[in-house]
Amino acid sequence: MNRPERLQPGVKLRDAEKVSRIPVKVVPSERETMLRKPDWLRVKLPASNQRITDIKQALRKNGLHSVCEEASCPNLSECFNHGTATFMILGAICTRRCPFCDVAHGRPLKPDAEEPKKLAQTIKDMKLKYVVITSVDRDDLRDGGAQHFADCIREIRLLNPEIKIETLVPDFRGRIDAALDILATEPPDVFNHNLETAPMHYRKARPGANYQWSLDLLKKFKERHPDIPTKSGLMMGLGESNEEIAQVLYDLRAHNVEMLTLGQYLQPSKFHLAVERYVSPAEFDELKELAESIGFTHAACGPLVRSSYHADLQAQGKEVR
């Protein structure tokens, strides 16, 4: 068996190069075997692209990244056109290689020490009132990137004192307590960490992650910050059953998670995990009813829902589908 070539710093691996490095073999999808996308997943493009262009230019000018672009989110046009974006810090190269995700894998460069200030200024220039800050996984860093998150939050609030900040964090594998100690110095307004799928599907979908670790991260943050909402997101269409997803909802509530996002998995390329089913809007409605009945304060459930989709409205408890 040939060993994978040594990763070079700053080089992005995508598609076949990326998924070839995971323990589960992903067979490229053939066009004739791919499920036809249903009508309810058609995205209406905005009449004007000027706002989209402006946001992209602001990101490029300051060397910043948005997960909207890096992960090929289907809602990019809508969110950018409404003047919202989810900023991705710590670079655009992830140390993990999840085969559902379109973010590049590789050996990241050293974190940009000026990124917190550049991010804060960009947010001020964009006149945003609510921002989501996420990151790639940085298993190469001793604290998993926690201090960089705290630095970004501090700088953002210095220039934008009225802003609300949601963090969508990685799992801080093997360093949860140390990371939470650091984050406690600059806690967000909403703490989000995605479970992504049911535990039976972790080996194929989230190599390197652990279902219980992710639950523990959410619970431990809530124990330290009982007044800050905790949130998690899941995808459907990776081979799970509705019953498996229902059990995940019960597990989240048992770990004091209050907010939920539930959406349809969409295959970024033929080299990624195939979509095994398209979940109907009616099924999402049923799971939303279950979530609300077991105590979630807000559940955004629908085919195009993503963890940061209209996050400001989610935080206000408004309907998002």
Curated annotation (Swiss-Prot):
Keywords carried by this UniProt record: 4Fe-4S, Cytoplasm, Iron, Iron-sulfur, Metal-binding, S-adenosyl-L-methionine, Transferase
**Residues at which [4Fe-4S] cluster 2 binds:** 94, 98, 101
* Start and end residues of each Radical SAM core domain: 80-297
Look up the EC number in the record and give it: 2.8.1.8
| Annotated metabolic or biological route of this protein | Protein modification; protein lipoylation via endogenous pathway; protein N(6)-(lipoyl)lysine from octanoyl-[acyl-carrier-protein]: step 2/2
Q: How is the cofactor bound?
A: Binds 2 [4Fe-4S] clusters per subunit. One cluster is coordinated with 3 cysteines and an exchangeable S-adenosyl-L-methionine.
Which residues take part in binding [4Fe-4S] cluster 1? 68, 73, 79, 308
> Is the keyword Nucleus assigned to this protein?
no
Q: Which SUPFAM superfamilies match?
A: Radical SAM enzymes
Q: Where in the cell is it found?
A: Cytoplasm
The record lists the catalysed reaction(s) as:
[[Fe-S] cluster scaffold protein carrying a second [4Fe-4S](2+) cluster] + N(6)-octanoyl-L-lysyl-[protein] + 2 oxidized [2Fe-2S]-[ferredoxin] + 2 S-adenosyl-L-methionine + 4 H(+) = [[Fe-S] cluster scaffold protein] + N(6)-[(R)-dihydrolipoyl]-L-lysyl-[protein] + 4 Fe(3+) + 2 hydrogen sulfide + 2 5'-deoxyadenosine + 2 L-methionine + 2 reduced [2Fe-2S]-[ferredoxin]
**Top EC category:** transferase
Gene3D superfamilies noted in UniProt: Aldolase class I
InterPro entries assigned to the protein according to its UniProt record, in alphabetical order: Aldolase_TIM, Elp3/MiaA/NifB-like_rSAM, LIAS_N, Lipoyl_synth, rSAM
Its needed co-factors are:
[4Fe-4S] cluster
Q: Which GO terms describe its cellular component?
A: cytoplasm
Q: Which GO terms describe its molecular function?
A: 4 iron, 4 sulfur cluster binding; lipoate synthase activity; metal ion binding
Q: Which NCBIfam families does the entry link to?
A: lipA (TIGR00510), PRK05481.1 (NF004019), PRK12928.1 (NF009544)
The entry assigns this protein to a family as follows: Belongs to the radical SAM superfamily. Lipoyl synthase family.
Q: What is this protein called?
A: Lipoyl synthase
